[in-house]
Amino acid sequence: MLKNYSKLLLVALMFVTFFFNACVDSQEKSKDIQSVLSELRVYGTTPDFLGITDSQTELTSKDLHGKLWLISFFFASCGDICPKMNAVKSKIIANNKSDSLRFLSITVDPETDTPEFLSKHRREMKYSDNRWLFLRMKNDTILQQFMNGLLVGYSGNPENHSARIILIDSKSKIRGYFDALDTKHVDSLESILRKLQ
């Protein structure tokens, strides 16, 4: 009887120790993330939006809470900077396996880039990571308000969209702008992401 009690006590003690260490590790990780974020400027808060993903589901600004997001703008028929930007995002995705990181590519040509067309584009380009969403805003007004709220500007002409990747923290704060076509900017972004994981 005493042996069983000792074994039970030992198992309970191991569980408590494991749980305590997990809590301490989690708190330390949270402090590390806060330390990295405190070094980054806050440019504003992500504006409200409503869009439809390539998988035909609604996505709102509330869905961004609790995760780190990298947001960029593109259009599926773009033959200039969009393929280069998406290649950069593909590389970032391959280098960052964290489930707390999400990627959002928003079309600036909602007339052409329907959710069905975005889904086809995803398949053709072999963008298979489920953390990467392709989004079409409900209408041009929402797209314009969202882009202006992110401080990237809206021209109404898809070919004049921003080449920047925007870092959004887990509280929907805008934390940085990184030119996807500038190696130094991309390296800086990847360095930040490594520290945040």
Segments the model singles out, each with a brief description of its role:
Residues 24-26:
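Bacterial signal peptide processing site
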Residues 29-62, 87:
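N-terminal "domain-start" segment that seeds a small globular fold
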Residues 61-89:
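Short active-site neighborhood of thiol/selenol oxidoreductases, capturing the structured segment around
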Residues 19-22:
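C-terminal motif of bacterial Sec signal peptides marking the signal peptidase cleavage site
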Residues 2-10:
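Bacterial N-terminal signal peptides that target proteins for export
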Residues 70-71, 103, 165:
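Hydrophobic beta-strand anchors of alpha/beta hydrolase catalytic cores
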Residues 86-146:
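Structural microenvironment flanking redox-active thiols in thiol-disulfide oxidoreductases
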Residues 157-197:
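Thiol-/selenol-based redox modules, centered on thioredoxin-like
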